[in-house]
């Protein structure tokens, strides 16, 4: 019985041969990567040369990039090269994905775009410097304060004003989906006291009398509006202006947004405006927002 069993084992063509990861065909690895998130792909690229080569496949990364990635390359990456960002030209889809996942400034540094590393969804930030703001050039009303808390290196601080109107717009080719627009605001002036960051509330006033109106509209006729009193001092809050839906691929959309408090019966002041955020609707929960 033992001899018979031994002869059967020896007759098996693959007996005694163990298959390792190096034996997995590269096209199988590529197919597997199509179902994985980018961080997992980058981790598995270290396994061996076959995994590394498969992790660089354009077929894998074309599937991970947003449908509007060609627009992003033209609008953002090529714009950076024109203003002197010294990076080599990008050809592979993996390199495009990696570059777009960084914070990318464009439009003379007044706007920023980046991809979520896992989902490939697009996020935008718009600086107050890209907006029209009442009295912004008058130092009696406004000042720009350097801050490492800002995406743009500085925040816009309102000392005091009667009529507040901050309006901005952006023309952008969004991937189809639903998006939220939020204003990043803080009541109180950031200062340093005894070497520590703190917030002065000395000039905060007028925001509890009448509500602030946040609005957005799009070139295809969508509108949204919300009103609220600003009552959270000493910390950054994302105030939700509204949502809009993009249905058509490869079709640029104008998005106009504003923040208004134009009741001239009282002054208001002590407010910091950092930026406006446009994010996929399902990601707005990552921001501490007021609705």
From Swiss-Prot:
Organism domain of life: Eukaryota
Task: Provide GO CC annotations from the record.
Answer: nucleus
The secretion signal range is none
Q: Localized where?
A: Nucleus
Q: What are its GO biological-process terms?
A: protein ubiquitination
Q: Name one GO molecular function term.
A: carbohydrate binding
Q: Which UniProt keywords apply?
A: Nucleus, Ubl conjugation pathway
Q: Which residues form the F-box domain?
A: 18-64
Q: How does it assemble?
A: Part of a SCF (SKP1-cullin-F-box) protein ligase complex. Interacts with SKP1A/ASK1 and SPK1B/ASK2.
Q: Which PANTHER family match?
A: F-BOX PROTEIN PP2-A14, F-BOX PROTEIN PP2-A15
Instruction: Name the chain's protein.
Output: F-box protein PP2-A14
Question: Which organism was this protein described from?
Answer: Arabidopsis thaliana (Mouse-ear cress)
Taxonomic lineage from the root: Eukaryota, Viridiplantae, Streptophyta, Embryophyta, Tracheophyta
Gene of this entry: PP2A14
């Amino acid at each position: 019985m033992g001899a018979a069993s031994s002869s059967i084992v020896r007759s098996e063509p693959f007996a005694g041969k163990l298959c390792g990861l190096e034996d997995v065909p590269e096209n199988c690895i590529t197919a597997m990567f199509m179902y994985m998130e980018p961080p997992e792909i980058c981790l598995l690229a270290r396994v061996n040369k076959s995994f590394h080569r498969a992790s660089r496949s354009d077929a894998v990364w074309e599937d991970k990039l947003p449908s509007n990635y060609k627009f992003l390359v033209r609008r953002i990456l090529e714009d950076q090269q024109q203003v002197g960002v010294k990076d080599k030209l990008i050809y592979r889809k993996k390199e495009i994905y990696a570059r777009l996942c960084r914070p990318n400034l464009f439009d003379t540094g007044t706007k920023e775009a980046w991809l979520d590393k896992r989902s490939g969804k697009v996020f935008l930030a718009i600086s107050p410097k890209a907006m029209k703001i009442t009295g912004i050039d008058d130092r009696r009303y406004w000042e720009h304060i350097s801050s490492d808390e800002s995406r743009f290196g500085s925040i816009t601080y309102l000392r005091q004003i009667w009529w507040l109107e901050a309006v901005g717009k952006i023309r952008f080719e969004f991937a189809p989906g639903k998006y939220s627009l939020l204003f990043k605001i803080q009541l109180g002036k950031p200062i340093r006291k005894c070497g520590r960051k703190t917030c002065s509330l000395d000039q905060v006033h007028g925001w509890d009398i009448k509500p602030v109106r946040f609005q957005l509209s799009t070139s295809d006729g969508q509108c949204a509006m919300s009103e609220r009193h600003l009552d959270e001092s000493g910390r950054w809050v994302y105030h939700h202006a509204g949502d809009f839906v993009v249905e058509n691929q490869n079709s640029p959309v104008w998005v106009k947004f504003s923040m208004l408090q134009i009741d001239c019966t009282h002054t208001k002041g002590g407010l910091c405006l950092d930026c406006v955020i446009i994010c996929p609707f399902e990601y707005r929960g990552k921001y501490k927002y007021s609705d």
